[in-house]
Amino acid sequence: MNIPTKFTTSKIRSDFLEFFKNKGHKIVPSAPLVPSNDPTLLFTNSGMVQFKDVFLGAEKRSEVRVADVQCCLRAGGKHNDLDSVGYTARHHTFFEMLGNWSFGDYFKKEAIMWAWELLTQVWELPPERLLVTVYHTDDESYALWRDMVGVPEDRIVRIGDNKGAPFASDNFWQMADTGPCGPCTEIFYDHGEHIPGGPPGSPGEDGDRFIEIWNLVFMQFDRQSDGTLVPLPTPCVDTGMGLERLAAILQHVHTNYEIDLFQTLILKAAELTAVADVQNKSLCVIADHSRACAFLIVDGVLPSNEGRGYVLRRIIRRALRHGWMLGVRQPFFNNMVPTLIAVMGDAYPKLQAAAESVMRTLLAEEERFAETLDVGMKIFNEVAAKVANGVIPGSDAFRLYDTYGFPVDLTADIARERGMRVDMAGFEAAMTQQRKTARAAGKFGRGVQLSAERAATLSPTVFLGYEQLQADDLRVVALLSDGGLTDSASVGDEVIVLTDRTPFYAESGGQVGDIGTLMASDGVRLEVTDTQKLMGQFHGHVARIVQGGVKVGDVLSGSVAVARRKMVALNHSATHLLHCALRSVFGTHVVQKGSLVAPDRLRFDFSHFEPISAAQMTLIERMVNDEVRANHLVMIEQMGMQAALDAGAMALFGEKYGEHVRVVTMGTSVELCGGTHITRTGDIGLFKIISECGVSSGVRRIEAVTGESALNHVLAEEHRLYEVAGLIGSNANNVVNHIRQLTDRQKTLERELEKLKGKLISGTITDLLSMAVNVADVKVVAARLDGLDGKALREALDRLKLQLSDAVIVLAGVTGGKVALVTAVNGPRAMGKVKADTLLSHVATQINGRGGGRVDFAQGGGEDGPSLRSALDGVATWVKQHLN
């Protein structure tokens, strides 16, 4: 493998950031693959996602020039490249997007000039190989390319509305049907005449000759609902350039999979799968998917059967299936991680830090899927063999998904390789039939949202609740109901009240929202039943008006329920101590996956791969209580994000942090946290774990209580201990020894009982042999055996079969009014003429029972009564009829 040294992927990445740093840009880290505070988006799929609120006017940033390298994923939802990965030159699930941004600072001139400078001077691309496109009415960009940069007119292409509507063009970008939008200019690289394909805008534009490198978007308009464009007061620049695609050009290779980064991964995949041909497409799939899976796990996604976890699971299983195609039958995929870290760990230190967690998660998924893949492939082959029209029925695809864990994408992938397809409509119909009725919407308020237009007119809510639980002069700035915005509300109405300031904590970070009251001097009273955060910055008081009325502009006083807030604070601080203890006991792979901090309990979900033993549970509980008794001062500081991380503070998955963060320190625990806490750890009083369980693959859950709730739990447990001691005639101090003696005695009695049963069966066998009836040289035994359970009955049957070479046997064990039936057919004379399952059905129906089995053995049951005797007495006659 010849890996170029001048423009390695790593160097291209650092060149880009250094270039824009020197142009006055602040370099920001990649946002997580899971978007913060954006439920509409499954994954971060472009560089602009983390700045979406800035463009919408819902967030303001202090810096006006920003550059980054954004990790992106396109493997689910609207933006899904999964099916194409491995089969095309440039499709990936995971990719890196280089981007520079201007928020009301520089505009077209600088963006175009710097893009050209970086491409031609830093990366030395020949200018004659570059071609640019502009929106057909964007004369300003056209002139800048021609007059300032010097691009010949025959290499500047105007692109019109080529998507069937006004301003619907490859060169006109818009976030949605309304809102920020504007023209864009794209830079293409010309691979030369020897590669098929035409320039952008031509009939041959889909060929591989001209490859898009960089897209510069100029957001200068606000699109109205009637389609008109209104100039934005502060135009913005949003650019994006795919790192892998650029690396292929700078390294003089044709496909992204030939660049240095991918070649290293492909060689490792070839080594793990023992494949000599490194051009094998399956190696490309494995290499690509190793990046997507590792970064998803690092960003807190774990395999599951829904949402983002399901997407991760199907990517993993697609990689494993390609390994299976190459003949691999043992876990291998997790061993891609060290090589991935070697090529990307310097740029993304979080990858190195989470190496153990990533490998263990992948290994667990490999072991789980190996159990079903072989069986699932056999079923697929059976289905495919019966298909005449090349379409796999949706019902069969659903059966593979529902029973064997095959994502339908995987089934479709296999089908496509065989020239077939899946009936997706039929699959969706089966899914709809299977899916349970969606849960009713939660309590009022959670589905109500604030429009972006209205949010842009408001300032973020000022939170007063760290220092005070009661506040006056809270001005109502917005009212929302199920119908949306409203100007006023009256008695009995349920509304969400937004005020300019508030002492009420809004639910976030797992901590429940505050409750309490909002009041006015004229007697108006609202009962606040919850507080929710809207758009990440507005506190919405979910309330019911119990007296008077309220309107926008009113001034209220607010009082938080003090006792409840204190109990919540106890549990929140205890959660921090628990998190710290878990990482101390199990290692740094332990990361919070979710939490609930309520007044009566806390729930903490965390990454770990095996159940916690009783000894470990005791150790964790003791460590937390040691910190409680140490009575540490809970220190809270505001500092810059990077300074906080440098100080060892833990940032939690799924949380969105600003430039300045709140750091909560208690003892050895240091976390970024916006929640409410106690003053000293001693305020917790007592910490007690009440349960531990697994909630999904690689995720455990601990539930615990603190303070008075913990004391009440201990007292209740003690009361149960005394009750148990009383039931066995012991005392609390000696109850364990007493129970051990009782269980030992029980085991002794059970062994003695088994011996007695054996003797009883031996005697019974002798009696049964003596009562056997000869029917056409076949011995027929039909008998009632009182006191024998199913196990003893089968043992008696097996002993009889050993002593009767040709026999038909029916035994009825009777205990407590219930009958257990077993039948057997043994030997060449009876086999083929008498069937055990048919005989059992004949007997069982006479005693209101049923059963089933094979031709040589069957079992079932029924009810005791007079009919049992007649049923058994008739067996010999029934056998005789069938033998003849």
Curated annotation (Swiss-Prot):
Its EC number is 6.1.1.7. It is an enzyme of class 6 (ligase). InterPro entries: aa-tRNA-synth_II/BPL/LPL, Ala-tRNA-lgiase_IIc, Ala-tRNA-ligase_IIc_anticod-bd, Ala-tRNA-synth_IIc_core, Ala-tRNA-synth_IIc_N, Ala-tRNA_ligase, Ala_tRNA_ligase_euk/bac, DHHA1_dom. Keywords: Aminoacyl-tRNA synthetase, ATP-binding, Cytoplasm, Ligase, Metal-binding, Nucleotide-binding, Protein biosynthesis, RNA-binding, tRNA-binding, Zinc. GO terms for biological process: alanyl-tRNA aminoacylation; negative regulation of DNA-templated transcription. The keyword Nucleotide-binding applies. It comes from the Bacteria. It is found in: Cytoplasm. It catalyses: tRNA(Ala) + L-alanine + ATP = L-alanyl-tRNA(Ala) + AMP + diphosphate. GO terms for molecular function: alanine-tRNA ligase activity; aminoacyl-tRNA deacylase activity; ATP binding; tRNA binding; zinc ion binding. It holds the Pfam family tRNA-synt_2c. Zn(2+) binds at residues 572, 576, 673, 677. Binds 1 zinc ion per subunit. Catalyzes the attachment of alanine to tRNA(Ala) in a two-step reaction: alanine is first activated by ATP to form Ala-AMP and then transferred to the acceptor end of tRNA(Ala). Also edits incorrectly charged Ser-tRNA(Ala) and Gly-tRNA(Ala) via its editing domain. Belongs to the class-II aminoacyl-tRNA synthetase family. Consists of three domains; the N-terminal catalytic domain, the editing domain and the C-terminal C-Ala domain. The editing domain removes incorrectly charged amino acids, while the C-Ala domain, along with tRNA(Ala), serves as a bridge to cooperatively bring together the editing and aminoacylation centers thus stimulating deacylation of misacylated tRNAs. HAMAP family: Ala_tRNA_synth_B (MF_00036_B). This is Alanine--tRNA ligase. The gene is alaS.
